[in-house]
Amino acid sequence: MRHIRRAQPEDANRIAEIEVFCYRLNFYPIFREDAFYFGEFQVTNRIGANQEHLDELLVYDDGVVKGFLRVADGEIKKLFVEPVLQGSGIGAKLLKYAVEQENARFLWALEKNEKAIAFYHRHGFRVTEERKFEEGTTEYLVRMELSR
């Protein structure tokens, strides 16, 4: 698919930027943990963490990396798009690629992340009965599976 490619080491900084901005936008309102979201969860800390999974990362790059996806063993582990570009179709393209080219069939979404659940639902994923706690929290994750 056009503009989607395997991540390279030089993408690590941009991937980390997108990840940190998306975490703050989507998860800070739920968890409200200042020390984590504005202290330890920094771009410089995420660069190395993402490089460890470079073989599982794909980026949407049309000259600038605008989104990324992590897929492993049929599971979508992460899918984030630069916040100011959300709603432009980049996430849908990454998700389609994950399903068609990487055989992605399921994911775990934070139960309170209604925006993410609605996005995946629009693209053929359904919430199952399976739930588990997000590690180290009292918030639930719900399992979503491709229903097509």
What residue ranges belong to the model's regions?
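A short helix-loop-beta-strand connector motif used in the catalytic cores of GNAT acetyltransferases and
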Residues: 44-58, 75
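Conserved beta-strand in the GNAT
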Residues: 59, 64-80
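A short beta-loop-alpha structural element at the N-terminal edge
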Residues: 3-17
